[in-house]
């Protein structure tokens, strides 16, 4: 889910994500990957099977792993996270209200919107 989460906040095309997962794993099957990638991982089915997208800030990664905060990867991750919320703001109305409030409270909006395209172009 973390890899799919990162691909989602990078706004990688869902079909490319699906293809990557199918080629990455020896035991990947359509009946598993279609739901895992398009529904749970990317919310690309428009909410048919999930109520909101599974996206997280770097805080979740820090809590669920032994990765340390270093001021680089977590800034990149959080920039992409908030950029994703900004670009999908209207889609979150009625579904992902927590994401809306996080964006609304964000103090570095202009900095994020300026930095995100630079990060995405380097990926």
Curated annotation (Swiss-Prot):
Domain of life: Viruses
InterPro entries in alphabetical order: Crypto/Photolyase_FAD-like_sf (IPR036134), UV-DNA_repair_photolyase (IPR052551)
SUPFAM superfamilies linked to this entry: Cryptochrome/photolyase FAD-binding domain
Protein name: Uncharacterized protein R855
Organism of this sequence: Acanthamoeba polyphaga mimivirus (APMV)
